Amino acid sequence: MARLNVNPTRMELSRLKKQLTTATRGHKLLKDKQDELMRRFIALVKENNELRIQVEQEVTDALSNFVLANATLNEAFIEELVAIPAEKVELEIIEQNILSVPVPKMIFDYDESVQEAPLDYGYVNSNSELDQAFAKISSILPKLLALANVEKTCQLLSKEIEKTRRRVNALEYMTIPQLEETIYYIQMKLEENERGEITRLIKIKSMNKEN
């Protein structure tokens, strides 16, 4: 590791020692942050996998019901039915922080009665498969939202982990070793100069005695 290009003076030595203290403290804080980010990221990945399995299974079940309903009901009736929803759904996105990482949190707001009757239609032209399909699709919405929240948070935490890792490595393998080597070099130079000065004074003293 190449040392820094500085003058070997006591003032420079003092300045570099302060820099080393700051860099060492910063490295510890960043390493702690990296470890905590990884812990939360792993927990979120596990949650994401569990949610995805649930959502995919429920979507598959809902689509199966819908396919069966579509096979026995009038196609025009189904198209008209799904053209206009029975209830307006509102989505609010707010920002929250996880270890100084801004992540979006989506809030899903709708009438709870929508889950019981997501679409307004009579039962004369319907069948049980259609009822089950719409009920399942409506019940999936909160889980889809939760899945979107978790996946976006995982994505942002992953980027922050990589950025923090680069900073930790830069301090650990470049900045701190450079400072340590430069400090060692200055200390050796100062000791060398001090020994040279002592030798010079001894010679002067010996010459004065001879005279």
Swiss-Prot record:
One GO term of the biological process aspect: proton motive force-driven plasma membrane ATP synthesis
Entry annotated with the keyword Ion transport: yes
Gene Ontology terms, MF aspect: ATP binding; proton-transporting ATP synthase activity, rotational mechanism; proton-transporting ATPase activity, rotational mechanism
Keywords tagged on the record: ATP synthesis, Hydrogen ion transport, Ion transport, Transport
Domain of life where this protein originates: Bacteria
One family name in Pfam for this protein: ATP-synt_D
Protein task: Produces ATP from ADP in the presence of a proton gradient across the membrane.
Family: Belongs to the V-ATPase D subunit family.
Protein name per the record: V-type ATP synthase subunit D
Species this chain originates from: Enterococcus faecalis (strain ATCC 700802 / V583)
